């Protein structure tokens, strides 16, 4: 009986890991395929989308994140990093998959630096949420493929 229960437990863990890896692979493929715009950014209830309307984001498979401001006279992109991590290995729900973005402090895109939870994703849209700890606010970010 113990062997059966152990086998069921191991099968459940393998299935959860497989589902998480499948989501991670899908989101990585979607993210790295094309140019993204910030179609919505709500910072603790304040709509700040227009502050980012001229930016284009490029997610590279290497984990590098390029941000380009169409109004900037500089040809140098804003450099950052991005990754996907499992914030809770106890289950395999989509909201346990973190979409991490980091830009240098003082960078125009620094407001986007966070470990965002994924609300939903399609081939052309990624919806993210971040609930700040310690009584902080809730931020929403929607990325749309251009």
Please give the residue ranges for each predicted region:
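C-terminal motif of bacterial Sec signal peptides marking the signal peptidase cleavage site
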Residues: 13-16
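Sec-dependent signal peptide recognition
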Residues: 1-7
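Lipid interaction determinants
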Residues: 18-146
């Amino acid at each position: 009986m113990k062997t059966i229960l152990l086998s069921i437990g191991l099968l459940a863990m393998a299935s959860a890991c497989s589902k998480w890896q499948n989501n991670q692979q899908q989101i990585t493929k979607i993210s790295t395929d094309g140019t993204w715009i910030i179609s919505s950014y709500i910072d603790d209830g304040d709509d700040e989308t227009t502050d980012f309307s001229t930016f284009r984001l490029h997610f590279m498979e290497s984990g590098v994140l390029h941000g380009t401001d169409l109004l900037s006279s500089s040809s140098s992109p804003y450099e950052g990093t991005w990754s996907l991590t499992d914030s809770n290995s106890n289950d395999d729900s989509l909201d346990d998959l973190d979409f991490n973005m980091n830009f240098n402090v003082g960078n125009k895109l620094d407001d986007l630096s966070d470990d965002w939870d994924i609300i939903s994703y399609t081939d052309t849209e990624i919806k993210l949420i971040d609930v700040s700890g310690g009584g902080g606010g809730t931020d929403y970010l929607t990325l749309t493929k251009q």
